[in-house]
Amino acid sequence: MSLNQLQLSLQFARFAEAPVHRAVLSRSKVTRWIRHALAVDAEITVRIVDAEEGQQLNREYRQKDYATNVLTFDYQQEPTAMADLVLCAPVVEREAREQNKTLEEHYAHLLVHGTLHAQGWDHETSEQDAEEMEAYETEIMVELGFADPYAK
């Protein structure tokens, strides 16, 4: 399988638990996970933030006043995808615990999910789109050696 090129910027906001998340998110892992979800070459910034920054961005850009797991800001989809993926560390950590997943596994899934959004995939437009996106996410996660993220 030929993987597309990725220009990655990986950023960690300053917060108390940042070292834990930095240890899980090596540049090589993040690059591998994102590249498996790319259908085109890409320039992507991944930023790991605390709850305060996550909530502020979600409120400002989606008018939802809470921190969410991943926000995708896509600027261009072709010929090169350009996007920022913002992941809220406390939310990711809580969800991983609630779903009995490792932190690494949940980050991998959310990075795949956000990368698909950066290329125009959308699960909020219709049930069919949601099913197609979930099926593709599952296929990618299995290729990466992880379990089906939607398995009950």
Swiss-Prot record:
Question: Per its UniProt record, what Gene3D superfamilies does this chain match?
Answer: Metalloproteases ('zincins'), catalytic domain
Q: Which Pfam family, any one, appears in the UniProt record?
A: YbeY
Q: Which PROSITE patterns does the UniProt record give?
A: UPF0054 (PS01306)
Question: Can you cite a GO biological process for this protein?
Answer: rRNA processing
- What Gene Ontology cellular component terms go with this record? cytoplasm
> How cofactor binds (record note)?
Binds 1 zinc ion.
Check the record and name the InterPro entries matching this protein: MetalPrtase_cat_dom_sf_prd, YbeY, YbeY_CS
UniProt GO molecular function: metalloendopeptidase activity; RNA endonuclease activity; zinc ion binding
Q: Does the keyword Hydrolase apply?
A: yes
Question: What are the EC numbers?
Answer: 3.1.-.-
Keywords, alphabetical? Cytoplasm, Endonuclease, Hydrolase, Metal-binding, Nuclease, Ribosome biogenesis, rRNA processing, Zinc
The cellular location(s) given in this protein's UniProt record come to: Cytoplasm
Look up the domain of life of the source: Bacteria
Residues the entry annotates as binding Zn(2+): H113, H117, H123
Where's it mainly located? cytoplasm
List required co-factors. Answer: Zn(2+)
Q: Which family does it belong to?
A: Belongs to the endoribonuclease YbeY family.
**Free-text function comment from the UniProt entry:** Single strand-specific metallo-endoribonuclease involved in late-stage 70S ribosome quality control and in maturation of the 3' terminus of the 16S rRNA.
Protein name (database record)? Endoribonuclease YbeY
What species does this protein belong to? Answer: Delftia acidovorans (strain DSM 14801 / SPH-1)
Instruction: Show the taxonomic lineage.
Output: Bacteria, Pseudomonadati, Pseudomonadota, Betaproteobacteria, Burkholderiales
